[in-house]
Amino acid sequence: MSDKFQLLLQQIGMPLDARQSGAFSTATIEKVVLHKVSKLWEFTFRFETPLPLMDYQLFKARLATEFEKVGNKIQFSIVSDAEAFEAGLVEAYYPEAFTEDLCQSAGFKALFQPLEVAYRDGVLWIKGPETIDTDHFRKNHLPNLVEQYKRFGFGNLAVDIQVCQEMTQQQAEIFHAQNAEIYQQANEENLAALEQLAQMAPPPEAAQPFVPEYKKNRPAKVNIEKAEITPMIEVDSEENRIVFEGLVFEVEQKTTKTGRVIINFKMTDYTSSFTLQKWAKNEEEAQKFDMVKKGNWLRVRGNVETNNFTRDLTMNVQEVQEVKKEIRKDLMPEGEKRVEFHAHTNMSTMDALPAVEDLVARAAAWGHKAVAITDHGNVQSFPHGYHAARKAGIKPLFGMEANIVEDSVPIAYNEADVVLSDATYVVFDVETTGLSAVNNALIQIAASKMHKGNIIAEFDEFIDPGHPLSQFTTDLTGITDEHVRGSKPLEQVLREFQDFCQDSVMVAHNATFDVGFMNVNYERAGLPIISQPVIDTLEFARNLYPDFKRHGLGPLTKRFGVALEHHHMANYDAEATGRLLFIFLKDALEKHNLTNLNQLNTELIAEDSYKKARVKHATLYVINQVGLKNMFKLVSLSNTKYFEGVPRIPRTVLNAHREGLILGTACQEGEVFDDLLSKGIDEAVKTAAYYDFIEVMPPALYAPMIAKEQFKDMAEIEETIKQLIEVGRRAGLPVLATGNVHYIDPEEEIYREIIVRALGQGAPINWTIGNGENAQPAPLPKAHFRTTSEMLDEFAFLGESLAREIVITNPNAMLDRFEDVQVVKTDLYTPYIEKAEETVAELTYQKAFEIYGNPLPDIIDLRIEKELTSILGNGFAVIYLASQMLVHRSNERGYLVGSRGSVGSSFVATMIGITEVNPMPPHYVCPNCQHSEFITDGSYGSGFDLPDKDCEKCGTKYKKDGQDIPFETFLGFDGDKVPDIDLNFSGDDQPSAHLDVRDIFGEENAFRAGTVGTVAAKTAYGFVRGYERDYGKFYRDVEVERLAAGAAGVKRTTGQHPGGIIVFPDYMDVYDFTPVQYPADDVTASWQTTHFNFHDIDENVLKLDILGHDDPTMVRKLQDLSGIDPQTIPADDKGVMALFSGTEILGVTPEQIGTPTGMLGIPEFGTNFVRGMVEETKPTTFSELLQLSGLSHGTDVWLGNAQDLIKAGIANLSTVIGCRDDIMVYLMHAGLPPKMAFNIMERVRKGLWLKISEEERNGYIQAMKDNKVPDWYIESCGKIKYMFPKAHAAAYVMMALRVAYFKVHHPLYYYCAYFSIRAKAFDLATMSGGLERVKAKMEEIALKKKNNEASNVEQDLYTTLELVNEMLERGFKFGKLDLYKSHATDFLIEEDTLIPPFVAMDGLGENVAKQVVAARAEGEFLSKTELRKRGGLSGTLVEKMDEMGILGKMPEDNQLSLFDDLF
C-alpha cells in the first residue's frame, strides 16, 4: 500500500522533500480501521526505521490538522523493521512520549518527564531517586511507556528505572510538596490573589472566554448546605469549591506509615462519576468521616484536581455531609397496592439486571403481597427467589416467559383436492407502511398468474395510504409518494384483485403476513376473506430443503439463480416467488412423489418443523406443587429435545403438562398481541381463549414500536391497549397490567443498554432501524419496576376506575389461585445402595483389623465408633460407599486416586480406601504383629516425621503414619454436615470414572453439575468501552468502572462443573429437584446438566466431585516407566527432603539452574510464589511441608501474617498457623474445650473473626489467654480470610513427594513423564539445540516477562525450558524429533536421551500425530509428497520438519509414486 501512503502524504500536505526522503519513500499503510460512529481513524504505518523526531512531529501535526478539518479524529502507530536503534534517537523521543495520551497521567508526567534517560544494551534506563516507588512505576506506568515507544516504531525496546542516589533530596521535596493539605491551602491563597487582581484590573475590552453556568457567580466561601450542587458530568477540568451530591459505590481506606489515613471513595450522581479523596491526621479523625460508606448518599465539597498517578480528575474533599436519600416508595395505602406479574432477573440471558434477591427485597419494601419471576426460557432464579421471598415474608410467583411454537406450521391453507401440475397459481406480494394490518396501510398489491411455469397474466396496483410515506417505508420498499399519488381507491383495487384470483391457488412467501393483511382489508371493505387454497413458499422451502440455513426470498433466489432486481417491491417479489414455486413443485414431485396439494401438509412437513416455526412468547406460572414439576419438565424438554436457537415448547407439549400452570399472554411478542395487530380483534379473541389472563403493559413499554413504524404515535398505542382490554372482556378473561421489569430503578436503564448493545446487530432484542450503514439501534423500552402510583399514571388514559381494576384489583384477585410451593427441599435424598450401612461398617473394621489388629487399640476403636455413629445415623453411608466404589474401579484400572478437601479427616474414609490420608494422631504400627504406639501430646505434627523404630514386640520395622486431623473438620462438630467428597482422578481416567457413576446409579439418575456463567467484571468493562466507542460516548475512567459494575453479573451462558456429578435417588424423579439441560446449549454434548446451579441443590442430593488431575496421571506414567509401586515410596526419603534446602542432591549448583532449591517441576512447590516460600523457610519435615501447602493456598495466611512472624523470629514454620485443622488441634492441646476450639477454627478459616460480635470474639480471646495462647497467635487469627484443610494439604504433599522421589532417584523417568504430561509449550529447535541455545531463549523470554510483553505461550515455554535446562545441566540429552522413532504423544527414553513426540511440534495435533505413526508402520516414507499424503501432514509441517533436519535428504517426489499417479 505504498502508493496509498504517498497519496495520503499529498492529501495532508507533507512537503515534497519529506515525501521523497528515505524514511517516507518506502513506507506503507499496513492497516486502517474506521470507527464510523466516533469518526476515529486508526492507522498502522510500516517504516524501515523509526522516524527522526522532527519528521515524526511534522507528520503527526499534518495528520491531526487535516483530519480535524473534516471532523475526524486520528490515532496512529508505526511498525519498524529495525532491530537495533541509535541511542540518541531513543533518548530524543523520551519527552515526546509525554505528549501522547498513553503517558498523560499527570502524576507520572510531572515526576518522570524531567528525569534523565540513557539508552544502552537495548534498554532505556530512567534515572530516578530512591523515593520513587519503582514497583508502582513498573506496574502502573512502565507498560504504557513501553507501548508508546512501540507506537513510535521501537518495537523491541525495553524500559526500566535505575535508582540515582544524588537525586534523593530534591525528589523528596517534590513529594512532600504534594501533600494534599498544602495543595488545598495553596489553591485557596492563589484564588484570593486572583480575585484581588481582578478587582484592581480595568474592565476587559476583548470578549471573555466561555464560562459554564455552574461556574458563574460562585462565592469565595461555600456553605455546603446551601451551595448549588454541580452535576458531575459538567466538570471536565480542575476547579475549586465544587459541591457534589451522589451515591458512594466504592470505598477504600489506607493508613500510611506515619499514621495518616487516606479515604479514597467513588461517587455517582448518575450523570457521571467521580473519584474523591479525604485525608485524616489519624484514625480518630478518620472516624469523623464514617458516613463515607458504600450505599450512602453524601454531599461533598472540595477542589477538583488532576490526580498524580491516574489520568482522571479527583476531588480533594474538604467537607462531607450525609444526605438522606430514600429509594422510591410505593405510597398507596395498604390493600391498594399492585402486584407485579412480569419481572425478569439477571438470569434472563443478556437482557435483564436485577438479582432476584434485590427484586424481592424491593417488592417487600414497597409492601407488595407478591412478585413474579418470569425469566426468558429458564427458571434459574427460582431457588434464590424462594429463599429470598421466605426471608422477606412475601409470596413468590414462580413463572417463566416461554417460547411457544406450533408443532408444525402448514405449507398450505384452505386445503383442497388440487393436482399441483394442473393448477393455476396467483403468486402475490403486498407492500405496506408497517407490520400491523390493523394500524398500517396497503400501498401495493402485485401478482403473477402462472400456469405450468408460465406467466399468463399480471396484476400490479399502487394504493395511496392518504398520508406521505415515511423515509423508513421508502428505504425498505423503494416506493415513493410519486408511485402512490393518484392511484385507485383501496376498495376498487381489492375488488379487482379478488376477481383476478378467482379459481386459482394463491401463493405467497411468508403467506401468513400477506394473507393476514389482505383479510383485514377485505373485512374492512365488506368483502369476503380469502377462501381458496394458499401455499406458503417460505414453509414449502423450509420443509423441502431443511439443510438450507436461510429460507428468505433473497437467499433462495440467489441459490436457484432466479432474478430479483428490486427486493421489497411487490411486482418483482411476486414474479421471483412464482419462479421459485415451480422449482419447488418439480423437486417435490421428483424427491417425494407429491402430486396433490393435500399432500403438502400430510407428507412433506418434517417432524422437527417446530425448529423453524415462529416463536411466540407466553408467561407460564406455577400455582401448586404439581405445576412446579410440570414447569421443570417443560423447561427440560425445551432446553434439550426441542432446543433450536432458543428453548422451544411445542403447543402439544405444553398442553400435555399444563396441569398446575396458568398462562398469561406476555408482551408484544405474544400471539394475542400479534393477532390483534396483524389479523384484527376477532382473531385475537379466538386466540385468547387458550390463556388464563390478558397482559397489558404501560404505553412506554410499547413506545419503541413507533420507531419501527408498527404504531404511528402514542395515541395509537393507547388505542391498542384499549382493544386488548376489550379482547379480555369478550374472551371472559381478567386483564392484568404488568411491567415487563428488566431493572429496578430508572437510572439503571443505561446498564441494560450496554448489555443489549454488546450483543451486536442481529440479536433479537437489539434490532435495528434501517439497513446497512444507515442502520441505527432501536430504542429500548423504559422497563423499570413501577410503583402502584406510577402504574396508575401510565394507564390514566383509561379512566381511574378501569386503571385501578387492571393495576390493583385483578392482579390481587389472581393471587388467590396461587398455593404455597416448595422449590428447594429441606432434607437430603441420597440414592439407595443395598446394604450400604452394613458394607461401610464391614469394610472399615476389616481394614482396621488388618492394620491394627483385633481387638483394636482403644484410640482406633473409639474413633471408628464416633465416625460410624455420625455416618450411619445421618444416612451418609451411601455417599461413602459410592465414593469407595469409584476409587476401587479406578485403582483396578491401574490409577491412584488423590483426595481433595477434608475427606482425609475421616478415618472411615481412610479404612475403606477413599483417601490415603490417615487422620489419626502420629503413630507407629507394626506390619507384622499389628502392635501400635500413638503420640498424642502434639510433639509431632505428622507420623511421617517420627524417627525410625523397630517393633518392641517382634522387632519388625514399624510403619509410620497419622496426620492428627480431627473428624469434626469434615462433618462438623455434631457430625451432621453433608459430606462433600472431592476426588482427584487421573485426567486420563476421569471419563471412565464419570461413566462409572452412570453404571452404578443409572443414566437417568446421574447428571453433570450445572453452572451459570455471568458477565464478569473485565468483560463488562469491555462492553462499556465498546459501547463508548460505537455510540460516540466519552466517559472518565471511574464512570466506566461504575457502568461496568452495573452491567456485570448478568447471565451469559451455562456450563458444567469440571468434575461434579449430581446423583438423584431412583425412588424419586430428577424433576422433583431441578430441570435439566445441555451445557452452553450444546445439544451434541454427551451429558446433560442440572438446570439449577449445583450449589442451589447440593444440600438435597448427592454430589460427587470426580475431578481430573495431572498428579495421578504422572504417578501412573512413572510407575509404568520404572515398575516401582508408588505406594511403597517412603514419605521421609532423605534425598527428597534435600531438594527443599538446596540443589546438591541433583548434582548441580543453584547458578546452573537459576534457583537455590530443587523445586522446579515439583507439584505444589514448583510455582515462583511457593519456591520463594521454600527458600525463606527451608522445610525439613513432612509436617512443615504441610504447613507450606496450607500457607500457600490460604488467603492472608502467609503474606502480611506468618511470613512477618517468621522473619521477626517470633515464630517458626512449625508453629505459625498453616492449615485450618491445626487451630483446633493446637487449641485443644493448649487446654480449650473441643467445642470452643472448633468454633474458633470455623470463625477464623472463613474470615469471620472480625465479623462476629465483639462479645463473642472477646470471650474466645479471654479463653485463649487463660490457656496461655500467645498474643501473636491470637492476632494472626484476626488477619486470616481463608484457610486450606490439612487433609487436602496432606494428600497433595504425598503425591508431590512421590513425584519428587523419581526426580532425585530416577531422573530420566521423571523428565520423560513431566514433558509428556505437565509441559504445556514446546520449542523443539531450542530444546534439542543444546544448553547455550536453551539459556539464550530463556533470557529472551525473561526480558519480555520483565517488560510485561511475554505471551501466555511464551510464559508456558519458559516453564518448560527451566526443566529442559535442569535436565541438560544434570548430564542428560534432548534429542530431535525422529520420523521413525518418535511416539505420537509421549516422550521416549533412549539411553541418556529423551526423544520428543510428534505432538510436541508446533501445529501438529494428536490425530495427525497418530496418523503419521500408523502410516510409518506400513512402510518407509519415500518422499515428502508421500509423507504428506500418507501421514496427513500439511505442506507447512513437512517444510518445518525439513528445516529442523528431521527428513534428512528425503526427495520431494519419487518416480514410483509419480508413475502410480499416471496410471
Curated annotation (Swiss-Prot):
The reaction(s) this protein catalyses: DNA(n) + a 2'-deoxyribonucleoside 5'-triphosphate = DNA(n+1) + diphosphate
Protein's name according to its UniProt entry: DNA polymerase III PolC-type
The family this protein is said to belong to: Belongs to the DNA polymerase type-C family. PolC subfamily.
HAMAP family: DNApol_PolC
Enzyme class, first EC level, given as a word: transferase
Gene behind this protein: polC
Function: Required for replicative DNA synthesis. This DNA polymerase also exhibits 3' to 5' exonuclease activity.
CDD domains, alphabetized: DEDDh, PHP_PolIIIA_POLC, polC_OBF
UniProt keyword Translocase, yes or no: no
Keywords, ordered alphabetically: Cytoplasm, DNA replication, DNA-directed DNA polymerase, Exonuclease, Hydrolase, Nuclease, Nucleotidyltransferase, Transferase
Pfam entry (one): RNase_T
Entry's localization field: Cytoplasm
